[in-house]
Amino acid sequence: MLNRTPQLLGPFDLPETLQTTARLVKEAGLEERITFLSGDFNRDPLGGPYDAVLMSDILHYQEPDANAALVRKVHQVLNPAGRLIIKDRFLDEDRTTPPWTAVFAVHLMVNTEKGRCYTLREASNWLTAAGFPEIREIERSSIVEGVK
């Protein structure tokens, strides 16, 4: 992503996770190009303003209220016309397809306290409630975008 997007700032993640990320970035020779933002996205300020925020594989580890609050929080730190891109594993409305996501949903139910897979409609509802007037499904069952 850094090679394709020169203006990319860098990841916001927990300090423990960023240690691994920093090592990988250094191995790729990109340490001069990236700024690490350390914190807990549910509790700490996100900084900003930003033109775009990518939330990757976050929703399925949280409860619906936490997801709705996080989407609202991201909306507040976006520039006008800013984009929130959510990459996750979305179930179809029948909650049994696509097959890989349905299997992953069972894995989350068995192995986590709060984890589950959501539908695209649920994610879209969080985006709408946060104030995103434009919502697009970018890739079926995995990527949705809200434009401020």
What is each of the regions a protein language model found here?
Residues 2-148:
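Alpha-helical subdomain
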